[in-house]
């Protein structure tokens, strides 16, 4: 049974989160959690929370056995960007894009 968990508007760019997502795609859930625990990136914390949520959803909603679960799909889409202004010299200003992302994790017992 496939179970989904999402984190929308995560405050990290999709490019940075995809680096972490690629590490756990296709792995068993226990192995994926170990990898994320020892990955020294902010995105790893975000992905780990979503993965733990997907595991809890599978256990609670579908009655799945945690030992059989695998990360079948994980993908990261771009979310909306917040536009900010940084003042520069001689009256100019630069636009700063504070990027967000949508993290989706799908776990399955097959």
From Swiss-Prot:
**Cellular component, GO annotation:** cytoplasm; cytosol; cytosolic large ribosomal subunit; large ribosomal subunit
Query: Which Gene Ontology terms describe the biological processes this protein takes part in?
Result: assembly of large subunit precursor of preribosome; cytoplasmic translation; cytosolic ribosome assembly; response to antibiotic; ribosome assembly; translation
The note filed under miscellaneous reads: The wild-type allele (erythromycin sensitive) is dominant over the resistant allele, and is also dominant over the temperature-sensitive allele at both low and high temperatures.
Q: Name one GO molecular function term.
A: large ribosomal subunit rRNA binding
The species is Escherichia coli (strain K12)
What gene codes for this chain?
rplV
What Gene3D superfamilies does its record include?
Ribosomal protein L22/L17
**Annotated protein name in UniProt:** Large ribosomal subunit protein uL22
Its domain of life reads: Bacteria
Kindly state the subunit structure of this protein: Part of the 50S ribosomal subunit. In TnaC-stalled ribosomes forms part of the binding pocket for L-Trp with the leader peptide and uL4.
- Amino acids binding L-tryptophan: 90
**What's one Pfam family the UniProt record gives for this protein?**
Ribosomal_L22
Q: Which controlled-vocabulary keywords does the entry list?
A: Antibiotic resistance, Ribonucleoprotein, Ribosomal protein, RNA-binding, rRNA-binding
> Matching PROSITE patterns, A to Z?
RIBOSOMAL_L22
Family per similarity comment:
Belongs to the universal ribosomal protein uL22 family.
Keyword Nucleotide-binding, does the record have it? no
Taxonomic lineage: Bacteria, Pseudomonadati, Pseudomonadota, Gammaproteobacteria, Enterobacterales
- State what this protein does: This protein binds specifically to 23S rRNA; its binding is stimulated by other ribosomal proteins, e.g. uL4, bL17, and bL20. It is important during the early stages of 50S assembly. It makes multiple contacts with different domains of the 23S rRNA in the assembled 50S subunit and ribosome. The globular domain of the protein is one of the proteins that surrounds the polypeptide exit tunnel on the outside of the subunit, while an extended beta-hairpin is found that penetrates into the center of the 70S ribosome where it lines the wall of the exit tunnel. Removal of most of this hairpin (residues 85-95) does not prevent its incorporation into 70S ribosomes. Two of the hairpin residues (Gly-91 and Ala-93) seem to be involved in translation elongation arrest of the SecM protein, as their replacement by larger amino acids alleviates the arrest.
Keyword Ribonucleoprotein (UniProt): yes
């Amino acid at each position: 049974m496939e179970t989904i968990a999402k984190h929308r508007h995560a405050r990290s760019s999709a490019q940075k989160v995809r680096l972490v997502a690629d590490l756990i795609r296709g792995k068993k859930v226990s192995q994926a959690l170990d990898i994320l625990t020892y990955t020294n990136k902010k995105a790893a914390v975000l992905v780990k929370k979503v993965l733990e949520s997907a595991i809890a959803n599978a256990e609670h909603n579908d009655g799945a056995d945690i030992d059989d679960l695998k990360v079948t799909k994980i993908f990261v889409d771009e979310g909306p960007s917040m536009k900010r202004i940084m003042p520069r010299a001689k009256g100019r200003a630069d636009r700063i894009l504070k990027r967000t992302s949508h993290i989706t994790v799908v776990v399955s017992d097959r």
